[in-house]
């Protein structure tokens, strides 16, 4: 569950559209860093206070939006990457955090797509479906080859950045390169068999070949994860039947303690 906070930071002059790096817990900035970097004292910023999609604002309105994080070579601390939403003059400001909606990442796994030999149709379609069913504060798409290690590393990084919902498409069949379940099951904290069963049932209504699907659902920390088939049609059919339950699942992952039973 997102907890708003406020902190003081000295900002350089910035133009809308630029990227600002926020460094937490540093006495100085990495050698060679550009001017677009600001330092926040660790005591001013609670842990996990800046998940992706967080908006930082002042009295004048929204100024920055967290879009990710990066690591400077040879420097241990993560840098938060913030998109500048409005022109900013240099000076010290009290920034307040706010976050409305969920952060979505869609990862398409396709050797041919990654090589530029096939257009990704599933990824954009999945984003559109989620956008129609959920309010989003941030969205991003990724395209990877069918390489388990790269997928596993990306999913762990996305969960660490605070993405609420991560959906992969591709690699759930029986071909030699279909290794998405093998990549993701080891990093799941919990499998969600109910979601998996509903997706399988919906697919079997369309074709008996759906028995070959190894689509899965689970959690990585507070991130909800779905691994869907690579076919655009199959991926959308799977997502459609579970999307209604996603908001409730995200609330529970965020710490909602209310009863789940219907009255």
Feature-to-residue mapping (PLM):
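N-terminal accessory interaction module
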Residues: 1-97
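Internal alpha/beta core interface subdomains
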Residues: 29-31, 87, 91-92, 99-103, ...
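Glycine-rich phosphate/diphosphate-binding loop of Rossmann-like nucleotide-binding domains
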Residues: 93-146
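Short coil/turn connectors at secondary-structure junctions
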Residues: 101-104, 161-163, 220-223
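Short beta-strand segments
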Residues: 107-109, 168-169, 227-229
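A general structural motif
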Residues: 118-120, 145-152, 204-210
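N-terminal small/polar loop signature for handling phosphorylated ligands or for N-terminal nucleophile
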Residues: 128-168, 173-187
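Proline/glycine-rich low-complexity loops and linkers
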Residues: 180-263
